[in-house]
């Protein structure tokens, strides 16, 4: 399919868009097969499409419990879609091409660069190989650690559970197979289990900081000054977005819990909105403030060039840096002694406005259609567009139009706002002439 799309001379953005759409379509058809469900009847088109979109877009929102509804075949299809979605369709296509010994063209290398947010085309094949090795290594290590918990509890089935949850966590998907204990229960039965909590949290964070950040850490170790500005911004922002919410949850949401459980719940609840979707606490029991904070974290999401979705940590950081620059009457925003490029600011503002607008619009429509509280619906749309998967429990009972809204938001959230814009709009080639400049008073 990759070669066919390139032969049609499509832009990188359109190849990425059609690539994800193609995998979703194939996954939908596979999930509709009779042996994909435990009833032997196959899933209805709407449920299959929703599940396939959620898996490929590594979201985790579900309309049927994964463990109790889908057969072993159906679960395997879902896991494969999670892996493809987490790695990226183009990265998977590149891996297949490299494994077959075929040469990757310059145009294909350019598409790979856009797909993984690499700074340059040079060395892109080697960098892709580094990404693939890293993904397999972290997922394997995560599975081995989880096996020490799941095999004693579930027997040999624990091997499958460990592999499934390791891949789902690393790819920031949030799909789980714990519905055999209680449908839609996620990881609530392991809320006070340190091994499960720490392993899942580490996989989520590592998968969500971005492949370029991996490379910086590998090459430069503890030498912070040698890191790219982007890696510094990602690591600093990630640290802040993990620490501050954890402190809030510790003091205001889980204060009645025993100390060890309280610490684990607080940490997990600050990590999982970073587009993972697992939960160890009952989210409906959170206060409205806690739910609103979670919505904000879900919208920000992970970092560019990672397995995570959302508007990205760098987008939030750039906008905050520019606001600070305005307060201090500086011409440009700054990070670590470097100015932020004007194009970066424009892109960040465009992404922010697109995500906020669609998040609000989707929430208002669902609230009207379903006659549900607006905060509950905004929680759902933030989870979808941030490709998170956390829910207040309303997803399975939504009407078709509400599910279609969530499907659209999940797809946009995974491919990215700018990718969608570039894929659907033609570039303006008239760059030589400029219109007259006139100032407008704002604020």
Predicted regions mapped to residue ranges:
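Membrane-proximal intracellular helices of multi-pass ion channels
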Residues: 1-443
């Amino acid at each position: 399919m990759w070669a066919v799309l390139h032969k049609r001379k499509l832009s990188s953005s359109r190849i990425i868009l059609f690539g994800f759409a193609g995998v979703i379509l194939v996954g939908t058809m596979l999930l509709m097969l009779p042996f994909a469900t435990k009833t032997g009847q196959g899933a209805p088109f709407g449920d299959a499409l929703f599940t396939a979109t959620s898996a490929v877009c590594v979201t985790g929102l579900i309309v049927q419990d994964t463990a109790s509804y889908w057969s072993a075949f159906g679960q395997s299809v879902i896991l494969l879609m999670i892996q493809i979605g987490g790695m990226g369709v183009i990265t998977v296509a590149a891996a297949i091409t490299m494994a077959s010994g075929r040469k990757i063209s310059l145009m294909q290398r350019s598409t790979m660069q856009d797909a993984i947010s690499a700074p340059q085309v040079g060395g892109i094949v080697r960098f892709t190989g580094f990404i693939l090795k890293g993904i397999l290594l972290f997922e394997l290590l995560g599975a081995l650690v989880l096996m020490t918990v799941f095999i004693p509890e579930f027997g040999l089935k624990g091997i499958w559970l460990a592999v499934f949850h390791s891949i789902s966590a690393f790819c920031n998907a949030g799909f789980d197979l714990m519905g055999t204990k209680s449908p839609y229960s996620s990881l609530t039965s392991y809320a006070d289990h340190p091994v499960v909590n720490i392993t899942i949290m580490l996989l989520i964070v590592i998968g969500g900081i971005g492949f370029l950040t991996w490379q910086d850490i590998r090459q430069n170790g503890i030498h912070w000054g040698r890191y790219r500005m982007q890696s510094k911004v990602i690591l600093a922002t990630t640290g802040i977005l993990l620490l501050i919410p954890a402190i809030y949850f510790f003091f205001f949401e889980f204060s009645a819990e025993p100390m060890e459980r309280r610490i684990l719940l607080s940490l997990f609840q600050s990590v999982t909105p970073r587009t993972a979707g697992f939960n160890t606490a009952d989210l409906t029991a959170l206060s409205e403030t806690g739910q609103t904070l979670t919505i904000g974290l879900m919208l920000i999401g992970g970092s560019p060039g990672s397995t995570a979705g959302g508007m990205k940590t760098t987008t939030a950081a750039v906008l905050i840096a520019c606001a600070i620059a305005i307060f201090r009457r500086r011409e440009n925003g700054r990070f670590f002694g470097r100015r932020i490029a004007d194009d970066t600011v424009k892109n960040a503002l465009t992404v922010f406005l697109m995500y906020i607008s669609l998040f609000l619009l989707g929430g208002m429509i669902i609230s009207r259609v379903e006659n549900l509280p607006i905060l509950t619906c905004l929680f759902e749309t933030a989870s979808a567009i941030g490709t998170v998967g956390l829910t207040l429990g309303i997803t399975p009972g939504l009407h078709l139009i509400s599910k279609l809204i969530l499907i659209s938001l999940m797809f946009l959230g995974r491919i990215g706002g700018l990718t969608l814009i570039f894929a659907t709009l033609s570039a303006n080639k008239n760059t030589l002439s400029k219109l007259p400049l006139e100032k407008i008073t704002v604020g």
